[in-house]
Amino acid sequence: MAPKTEALAAWSGGWLGSARHCPSPNFGPRPAGALIDLVVIHSISLPPGEYGGPEVFELFTNRLDWDRHPYFDAIRGLEVSSHFYIRRDGTLWQFVDCDARAWHAGRSSWRGRDNCNDDSVGIELEGLEGDEFEPAQYQTLAGVCAALAERYPVAYVAGHSDIAPGRKNDPGTGFHWARLRSELGWPSERFPRPLNETAGKA
């Protein structure tokens, strides 16, 4: 099936030209010979369920004031990052060069390979597990996936919950896998679950 979504603007190294850039210090080199063939989809909001603030940017750049909100004490000292972050309005931000290893997956495994940070690109959606995502987010997400597939041998898309089952639940039941597949025009084999499941229906 031909892709329905065009890839976003050109690359400059591992930086996507159509994204706004906010470099994070939380990254490292990928292992020699790493095959970047997986896109991992996450959801995040800080504090949980609150949208539009600067807290995700501050977390990914190690500038979050841990005392600003009671929830932040539970993540105090956390150093994480994602390659991309898509806000509710579809605005795309990039924190880490895709040629580098972002710190988004944690303890994880996919198709027999552990440590998914080594060979994946992480994309955070502004949202809360169980909540619906915005049409603009799906459109931007599909464009990023298409762009990644032009630059890297991307073969699969999975949720954080798929690579860390029992430990992570995002992006959650509000994420519609069938909608992403429809936007991309990719075969169902590239996605983590049967697309006729309730949570996967558009």
Q: Model-found features: residue ranges?
A:
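N-terminal catalytic cores of peptidoglycan-degrading enzymes
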Residues: M1-D114
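Conserved, mostly hydrophobic/aromatic
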Residues: I41, I123, L141
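Residues immediately flanking
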Residues: S43-I44, L125, S161
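Internal catalytic-core helix/loop-beta-alpha segment
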Residues: L92, S120-L125
